[in-house]
Regions:
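Short, charged surface segments at domain edges that flank catalytic/cofactor-binding sites
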Residues: 1-15, 38-49, 90
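Short cysteine-rich loop/turn motifs with clustered Cys
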Residues: 2-29, 53-58
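Short Cys/His-centered divalent metal-binding micro-motifs
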Residues: 24, 45-74
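Short recognition patches in nucleic-acid-associated and regulatory proteins
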Residues: 25-40
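Short edge-strand/loop segments of extracellular domains
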Residues: 36, 73-81
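Short flanking/linker segments adjacent to small metal-binding domains or redox-active Cys/His motifs
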Residues: 78-126
C-alpha cells in the first residue's frame, strides 16, 4: 500500500476502528489475510473493502491473542476466507456503528444494524 492509498483509507476511517486513536501509530489492517485463508484471494487482498485503519497496538493484539482475534471476527475486523469484505459489515467501535466498506474507499453507515447492542456503558468491555 502506498502513501496515497493509505491517505484515502485514513480519509474514510478517520481513526483506529478499535480505540479511536488518530496518532502516528495508525496502520492498514487486512480484514481477510493470508493467515485467515486470504492467500487464494490475492486479487482482492488489497481492495479497499478488505482494509481498515487500526493502531499498531490493536493490530498486534488481534494478530497474537486468541481472545482479541475472536473479538476481531465478531466485529468484522477479521474475516474468514469465505466472507466477502464488500458485503460484510465492520464495526466502528468509537462511533458505535456498523458500516459497509466499498472498494472505492466509500463507507455506508448501517444505522439500524445491531442498534442497541453496544452502549457507552458496556463498550468498555470490548
Amino acid at each position: 500500500m502506498n502513501r496515497r492509498e493509505f491517505d484515502k483509507l485514513l480519509a474514510r476511517d478517520k481513526h483506529c476502528l478499535h480505540c479511536g486513536r488518530v496518532d502516528d501509530t495508525l496502520i492498514p489492517q487486512h480484514r481477510a489475510n493470508r493467515g485467515f485463508g486470504g492467500a487464494g484471494r490475492k486479487s482482492t487482498l488489497n481492495n479497499a473493502s478488505n482494509l481498515i485503519v487500526f493502531c499498531a497496538e490493536a493490530n498486534e493484539l488481534i494478530e497474537s491473542d486468541a481472545g482479541w482475534a475472536d473479538r476481531a471476527r465478531f466485529f468484522g475486523w477479521k474475516l474468514s476466507r469465505w466472507a466477502d469484505p464488500s458485503t460484510t459489515p465492520v464495526y466502528d467501535l468509537p462511533n458505535m456503528i456498523y458500516c459497509i466498506l466499498g472498494d472505492d474507499y466509500s463507507r455506508v453507515e448501517l444505522h439500524n444494524f445491531g442498534k442497541g447492542y453496544l452502549t457507552n456503558e458496556n463498550r468498555e468491555s470490548f
